[in-house]
Amino acid sequence: APITIFYGNNGCGKSTLLKTLAGIINPMRGVVPSELLNMNFMVSNYISIPEEVKVKDIMLLLGNENCNYVKNKYGNIYQFVEKLERQTVKKLSSGEKKVVEIFSSLALHKKYLLLDEASNALDITNKQFLLDTLISVSQKDIVVFYVSHNLNEIIKLNGEVYCFIPKFKTIRKIQNEELIDNRFKDLITFGADSYE
């Protein structure tokens, strides 16, 4: 399935929507489907693994069967995490922590992966690996929801982009080619009156 991307300026509600889908906050209206609530895993800057834990301990906690599932289905992610197994979470870079979280979600057979600006504070190498990882898992059987305001990574992910337009209190599905159109940027940034 294509990656679902929520795009917009800071404070427009992208993260709030993601937290609602994750069950962290209650919806203002309606109901989040129970399958989504029960089968999601959120990767973000405000949820963390205890720093003193070793990656090997995380793998042991997940169990051999679950780790082997990741190894067989997502070999590149397994190999990446396996190389880190002797390190404590404290010694991992931000990007490595996020990949360990994604590994955990895959080992737990979660169907929905929710990421809130997960590439923030990542160097170019880790950002590239993270984006490639998301593309890889989305091409299998994982549904990825991704919050960002970075146009370059949105274009790289090549998913379904839903843009939050605060002036009109609306969310609009857009095409990747619209992301580089200055009129569209003006609508998002300055609240232009229209975009045709």
List where the protein language model places each region.
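ABC ATPase nucleotide-binding domain "signature" region
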Residues: V100-S105
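Helix-to-loop junction immediately C-terminal to a conserved catalytic motif
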Residues: A22
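Walker B catalytic motif
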Residues: E117-A118
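ABC-family nucleotide-binding domains
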Residues: D123
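Q-loop/switch helix immediately C-terminal to the Walker
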Residues: E51-C67
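Conserved ABC ATPase signature
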Residues: T88-L92
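H-loop/switch region of ABC-family ATPase nucleotide-binding domains
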Residues: V147-H149
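A short, proline-enriched helix->beta-strand linker immediately N-terminal to the Walker B motif
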Residues: A107-K111
